[in-house]
């Protein structure tokens, strides 16, 4: 079951999804496997419309980890896009 982000809410779908690292390239893979299970971890990034805990609404680049059978975990906002 996928963990939901704690510090922000997704208001739309995630676009421009890219894989940053996979397998041994994911530095936190041992921690992730120990806490959530799964084997084939990938670090991902994408852009989504979000609302953060301060009430700000807009597009932001977000990063997360995912594995087959586990889902998406450990979400982070990396960059906010302002007009």
Whereabouts are the PLM-identified features?
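Cysteine-centric segments in proteins
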Residues: 1-83
